[in-house]
Amino acid sequence: MCGIAGAVNFNLSHNTINATMYHRGPDEHGDYASGNVNFFHLRLSILDIGGGKQPMHLDDRYTIIFNGEIYNHNELRKLFNIKGTTASDTETILLLYRQFGTDFLKHLDGMFVFAIHDKENNTVLIARDRAGEKPLYYYKDNEKIVFASELNCLKGMLPLQMEEANFYHYLRLGTFYREFTPYKNVTELQAGSYLLIDCSTLQIQQSRWWNIHDFYLQENNDPFEKSVDTVDAFLHTSVKRRLESSDLEVGCFLSGGIDSGLATAIASEYNHDLKTFTVSFDDEYNEAPLAKLVADRYNTHHTEINISFNNLKSDLEKILRNYGEPFFDSSAIPAYYVSREAKKYLTVIINGDGADELFAGYRRYVPFSKY
């Protein structure tokens, strides 16, 4: 996890960025200014620790700030016969953009948000990954455009005003729907989308480079057994790539469910010294015993963190403030405690998020089966 911020026609406050997003990138920071464009990057070093410093430049024309990981970047270098001076996936993005423009996005397997300034065309490209795993918010008015990884950062640099109409979505759905945020003129860049900003006119061209809806429209007539084998192969590739893309040790969160248990089982095939972490509660919702069964089965180094009401009284406000907006999902609470404990030992974690949504893990997803 890194933190990025940038602006067109606006001077970034480095102090504010550090104050609000230091937790995203404590290892090093860098800045860039050219004409009316400003970038700032806070780095959490995971891959090519010595050679992946940012902002990164290419040909005295392109400059990038990047948050995320491209799991197949080495494969893409071989596929397109491109060579760089580092082993960094950041440089791979720049090299691919120089060669293919925005068409290269469809080849990326990863979680990412990045911004590239093209000095020759006087544009800034901002792109987000397929699932929206990495966050990006941007503010636009008639005079400037400012973007950052977190709402708290924008709020610290700009006199934002509440957009009361957008709270309808939150009160009805428990979340701000799609691009909407609590603030006027502030938009969340949608998953699988990119912005191309003309730095001279502040005009924005927004495009979807990937849409999950297209895949729902595709029929799959494979027999059940073949579908199981296909999912198994994809899961193994996914977990293996995440383990191999880090120069640091990788661990797993365990919730007691099938999703994180399966991720742990696969990870243990490639890492025989795996660390796992779970939270426990003093009530009927406690799944820690199930998590321990998985940990014992795969012989992991397991840590269990107990959460009590006394913990929550002292930490709840801090947990909520981290999101920069009202947040309805109670899973934020155990996620905070298990992450805080895991950070004592590791920097990179694999979890099982998304499995319930993809495979209808709850009864509430049954009505969608007709689609």
PLM feature spans:
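Cysteine-centered catalytic environments shared across enzyme families
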Residues: 1-324, 335, 339
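Exposed, low-complexity/repetitive linear segments and helix-based recognition motifs
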Residues: 284, 326, 350-353
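Catalytic subdomain that performs nucleotidyl-dependent activation
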Residues: 327-334, 369-371
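Active-site adenylate/phosphate-handling loop in enzymes that bind or generate adenylated species
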Residues: 337-371
